[in-house]
């Protein structure tokens, strides 16, 4: 006789096995109508599933944020049905719900184009209107393989073959169409509603491997109501306007090319911006007691085997074989094993702890070409990486110190608010459950001490320890995970790190892995999009441009530019034989924040007319006043 505990703490007893649908109906007709799925002991399930034991149950309705994943998952299935109805012979592969929407990958001779989307969307609306129920079926593995092979669905057959032997093979039907799926789903296609839209097409390799067939991917977005959909579509339009790749070209900051996939060619202005961010982070790290080091790019396989990266991270590493020396080297994907080597070089004392070791380390990680995105997702990058070697008793204080530094950095870059996620043990991982229990408890305790509130991000920790993930929200409401703090008891053990205790014994340090901005490349992409290229003056790669009205003022324009440069400002000069309106237009398109216009009158009076980006108004002031004003505005926040 199952006893079902509801969120309000009340318990309902049932005489025998009971479905979620029956439980909802027993509570009331309103819930029976509103319930879309249920969460049973923390696991999402279809309402049709039968419960035959005591459980904690929560119903998911359209008011719950959890319903979004259900809506998007179901929409992906309906899109796949619509595609196969309209384009017979198309094979389906995988189609998950993702943040903000869903997608499905298809295999066909002709890739889809944006022109195909209206017809697919219309067919989806037909299927949704029919409100066919989602029905879960458990199939025999061999039967499922034979079924999909007979239908020419070789990708589905491959997926089933690769599932663990212990995995239950489940199929979901919606009317006459079916798909391999773990679920859960809502009651029927009608629960999706009409607040969805197909947004774009793209290419993707099967399983992200360029050696596999190229698939045609269709993206869509789905929401609980039209208001949410409209807001999201508006956000997408704004994101397109702010796209860092477009603005990067417009401002001449960087470019990417096929000969160096996933690597950035920084142009003069972009590199100036990069160095400004790096210099700021260097000053902040010095302020908070970090030493800076530099470690090698290529390291012997033996070190990566000892650290655990070879077993847990090799698929993301670039490997190089040295034939003459019979060695296998790897380009470092992260700096942590290298920092342990510096810690181990010589005898360490407890008096040296905490030791805060930082490196703007260049790292390389393999990412499938289809996953790369401008400078925001690359293969070659540098990050504000640091490792704190400390005792267990120092974890809480170091966490408080780190969070304070992080708050200042984010505020200075224009992100005064952030959220925190606690990422716990993943599979696979290094270290025993006992060690993980200890690490997770230490990090939770440190969060309490630091006053950090968090939500749990299950299974997303690093293979060597749990971590905090710090998530920024940008100007148009998008979230970006940048900072991390990870507690690691595993790596010091694996790499035999130790220090001399106060009692002259030996002990292992705890290793705190931390980053604030993370990848400089990605963070600069976020900065570009957050301010749409209109940087605060201290970050602007070109802080001012001097434009002459007439050629007679060219010499004075050069003098003004020289004075501004002497004051430490990044300055451009436009003395072309063009009309001033054309110069102002070109400099505005390049998003130069301050245009100093000079003509014969300004030259005679030693003044300038300043036009701010986006303003038609010009302010006249003496050259000395202009220099003082701009110099003050261009001073980095930590130096004011």
UniProtKB/Swiss-Prot annotation:
Quaternary structure note:
Homodimer.
Can you quote a single GO CC term?
cytoplasm
What does the entry comment about cofactor binding? Binds 1 zinc ion per subunit.
Q: Species name for this entry?
A: Acidiphilium cryptum (strain JF-5)
- What is the protein name stated in its UniProt record? Threonine--tRNA ligase
Q: Quote the EC number.
A: 6.1.1.3
Q: Which family does it belong to?
A: Belongs to the class-II aminoacyl-tRNA synthetase family.
Nucleotide-binding among keywords: yes
Domain TGS spans what residues?
Answer: 1-61
Chain's role? Catalyzes the attachment of threonine to tRNA(Thr) in a two-step reaction: L-threonine is first activated by ATP to form Thr-AMP and then transferred to the acceptor end of tRNA(Thr). Also edits incorrectly charged L-seryl-tRNA(Thr).
């Amino acid at each position: 006789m199952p006893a079902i505990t509801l969120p309000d703490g009340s318990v309902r007893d049932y005489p025998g096995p009971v479905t979620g649908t029956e439980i909802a109906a027993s509570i009331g007709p309103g819930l029976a109508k509103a319930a879309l799925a249920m969460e049973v002991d923390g696991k999402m399930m279809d309402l049709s599933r039968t419960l035959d034991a005591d459980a904690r149950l929560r119903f998911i309705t359209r008011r719950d944020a959890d319903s979004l994943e259900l809506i998007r998952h179901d929409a992906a299935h309906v899109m796949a049905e619509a595609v196969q109805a309209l384009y017979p012979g198309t094979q389906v592969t995988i189609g998950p719900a993702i943040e903000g929407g869903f997608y499905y990958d298809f295999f066909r001779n002709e890739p889809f184009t944006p022109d195909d989307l209206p017809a697919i969307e219309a067919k989806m609306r037909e299927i949704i209107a029919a409100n066919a129920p989602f029905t879960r079926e458990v199939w025999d593995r061999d039967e499922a393989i034979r079924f999909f092979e007979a239908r020419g669905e070789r990708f589905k057959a491959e997926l089933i073959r690769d599932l663990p032997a212990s995995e239950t093979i489940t199929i979901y039907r919606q009317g006459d169409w079916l798909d391999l799926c773990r679920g859960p789903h809502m009651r029927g296609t009608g629960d999706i509603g009409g607040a969805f839209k197909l947004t774009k097409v793209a290419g993707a390799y099967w399983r992200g491997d360029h050696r596999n067939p190229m698939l045609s991917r269709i993206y869509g977005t789905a929401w609980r109501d039209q208001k949410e959909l409209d807001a999201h579509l508006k956000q997408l339009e704004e994101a397109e306007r702010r796209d860092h790749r477009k603005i990067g070209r417009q401002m001449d900051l960087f470019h990417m090319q096929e000969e160096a996939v996933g690597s950035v060619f920084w142009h003069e202005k972009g590199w100036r911006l990069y160095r400004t961010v790096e210099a700021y982070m260097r000053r902040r790290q010095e302020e908070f007691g970090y030493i800076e080091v530099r470690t090698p790019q290529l390291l012997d396989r033996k070190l990566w085997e000892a650290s655990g990266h070879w077993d847990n991270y090799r698929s993301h590493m670039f490997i190089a074989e040295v034939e003459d020396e019979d060695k296998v080297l790897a380009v470092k994907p992260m700096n942590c094993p290298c920092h342990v080597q510096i810690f181990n070089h010589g005898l360490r004392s407890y008096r040296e702890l905490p030791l805060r070791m930082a490196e703007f380390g260049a790292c390389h990680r393999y990412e499938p070409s289809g996953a790369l995105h401008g400078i925001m997702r690359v293969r070659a990058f540098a990050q504000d990486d640091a490792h704190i070697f400390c005792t267990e008793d120092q974890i809480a204080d170091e966490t408080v110190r780190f969070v304070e530094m992080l708050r200042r950095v984010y505020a200075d870059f224009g992100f005064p608010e952030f959220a925190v996620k606690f990422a716990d043990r993943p599979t696979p991982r290094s270290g025993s459950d006992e060690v993980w229990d200890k690490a997770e408890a230490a990090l939770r305790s440190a969060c309490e001490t630091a006053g950090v509130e968090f939500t749990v991000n299950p299974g997303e920790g690093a293979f060597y320890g749990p971590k905090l993930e710090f998530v920024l929200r940008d100007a148009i409401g998008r979230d970006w995970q940048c900072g991390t703090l990870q507690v690691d008891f595993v790596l010091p053990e694996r790499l035999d790190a130790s220090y001399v205790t106060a009692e002259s014994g030996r002990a292992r340090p705890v290793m705190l892995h931390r980053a604030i901005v993370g990848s400089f490349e990605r963070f600069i992409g976020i900065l570009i999009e957050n301010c749409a290229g209109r940087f605060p003056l201290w970050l602007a790669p070109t802080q001012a441009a001097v434009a002459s009205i007439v050629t007679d003022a060219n010499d004075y324009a050069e003098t003004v530019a020289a004075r501004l440069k002497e004051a430490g400002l990044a300055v451009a000069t436009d003395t072309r034989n063009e009309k001033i309106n054309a110069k102002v237009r070109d400099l505005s398109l390049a998003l130069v924040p301050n245009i100093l216009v000079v003509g014969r009158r300004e030259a005679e009076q030693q003044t300038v007319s300043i036009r701010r980006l986006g303003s038609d108004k010009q302010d006249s002031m003496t050259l000395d006043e202009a220099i003082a004003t701009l110099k003050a505005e261009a001073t980095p926040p930590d130096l004011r």
